[in-house]
UniProtKB/Swiss-Prot annotation:
Domain Bro-N as annotated: residue spans: 4-136
Name this polypeptide is given: Putative Bro-N domain-containing protein 201R
Organism: Invertebrate iridescent virus 6
Record-linked Pfam families: Bro-N, T5orf172
UniProt keyword Lipid biosynthesis present: no
Length: 419
């Protein structure tokens, strides 16, 4: 960094060389109280919005327009030849230019993010301003200039490295904080959802499932299975059925049992016992009473066991859902759905089938020409046996087919497989 001020040759500006780039700063005022062109200083210090920097960073008492300085000429007339700045008549725009004094200069330097700002400040404070005041001229010797330039380049390289490392660290910290923030937000969202849905509240068997019939229906193995939300609804339900005509005088219950959700029980019964319904338009089941009660008890027992399992683990389920890391399972390939489930490790079929079978499958694949690129299992097995009659598929058909798909996909990706 180099600065050159020769007030004998030029009283209007000083020249500063920073990292090989030469800059001029226009001057105004007097030797005892110099003012610097604010726009020039902002340019050197890297301010993008110069007007905003001068407006917000420099106090009013530390800045003046050039026209104000020019008109007042700052009441010192004894300095004569050392009055700084242009002596020519100012244009309108020149007169509006903002100049800053020493405190204003420090304000801009302290607020600057330029890597050399601190060095610039030291130079202004220790050398430039004292030189202006005492001698009216200042220059940095060539050796010092060269040394400063090399130091600036070295500092710049090290500073750029530090800036890069700092930026990477900040980027990583920001990414980490963002992940933590997102994780926290998701946790809070899940927690609010579970609290709103009362996930930790114990479920109580307050509803009822029943079997209802009449004397006539009972003699013909006909029964109505239904449910209600409360005990008081049981009696009123007897008069509400629309289960077809009956020769008996009234319906009555032969089975009543508490449950958590009668609708889920009804849904299961309709799904499993739909073939025993009188027809699809009514809800009469035709089945021996002993079997119907057995089935209903089995469903109810399973439902009660499930409710017990949920109730005994509700708080832990909620805590795991909020705090535990997600379990990520690999997707199930549809062609493998009969053989593996999510989380299972694929088997090493080469150790299961042996090298002789593998070689036979490869040979059969290379000579196989499926119609429409669709490989059908039975057709390929016949082709395999015709090429290698000594191989046996007994107990190995699924493994053979699985390996055929794996090897075939690598040979011809266009092939499709039909079991």
């Amino acid at each position: 960094m180099d600065a050159l001020i020769n007030l004998k040759d030029c009283k209007e500006y000083m020249t500063i060389t920073i990292n090989g780039n030469e800059h001029q700063i226009k001057l105004a005022g007097i030797i005892e109280d110099p003012y610097f062109c604010g726009k020039d200083v902002c340019t050197i210090l890297g301010y993008k919005d110069k007007e905003q920097a001068l407006r917000k960073r420099v106090k009013s008492k530390h800045k003046k327009s050039l026209s104000e300085l020019f008109e007042k000429k700052l009441p010192v007339v004894t300095t004569g030849n050392f009055f700084l700045g242009t002596q020519n008549e100012l244009s309108y725009h020149e007169g509006k230019s903002i100049y800053i004094n020493e405190p204003g200069l420090y304000n801009l330097i302290m607020s600057s993010e330029a890597p050399f700002a601190e060095q610039f400040q030291d130079m202004v404070y220790e050398k430039i301003l004292p030189s202006i005041r005492k001698y009216g001229s200042y220059s940095i010797e060539q050796k010092l200039s060269s040394a400063m330039e090399q130091l600036a380049l070295k500092d710049k390289s090290e500073e750029e490295l530090q800036i890069k490392l700092q930026e990477e660290r900040i980027e990583k910290e920001n990414a980490y904080m963002k992940l933590r923030s997102e994780a926290k937000r998701h946790k809070e969202q899940i927690k609010r959802t579970l609290e709103f849905n009362q996930a930790t509240k114990q479920i109580e068997p307050l509803e009822y499932i029943y079997i209802c019939t009449t004397e006539y229906y009972q003699q013909h193995h006909k029964f109505k299975v239904g449910g209600v939300q409360s005990f008081k609804d049981l009696k009123s339900r007897l008069t509400q059925y629309n289960s077809g005509e009956s020769n008996s005088e009234a319906h009555f219950f032969i089975y009543v049992r508490k449950t958590v959700s009668y609708r889920s029980i009804e849904h299961i019964i309709k799904g499993l016992l739909s073939g025993f319904r009188e027809n699809q338009s009514n809800e009469l089941y035709i089945m021996h009473c002993d079997w119907l009660v057995k089935f209903l008890d089995a469903i109810m027992d399973g439902n009660a066991e499930f409710a017990l399992l949920v109730n005994s683990n509700r708080e832990q389920i909620a805590l795991d859902t909020i705090n535990k890391e997600p379990t990520i399972l690999p997707p199930i390939k549809l062609e493998q759905i009969a053989y593996i489930r999510a989380g299972d490790e694929p088997r090493d079929l080469s150790s299961v089938l042996g090298q002789e079978m593998i070689d036979s499958i490869k040979e059969a694949i290379e000579s196989f020409e499926p119609m429409d690129n669709t490989v059908k299992r039975k057709e390929f097995e016949l082709h395999l046996l015709s090429k290698s009659p000594n191989v046996s598929l007994t107990g190995k058909r699924r493994d053979t087919w699985e390996l055929t798909r794996q090897l075939g996909s690598s040979i011809n990706p266009m092939w499709r497989y039909k079991y």
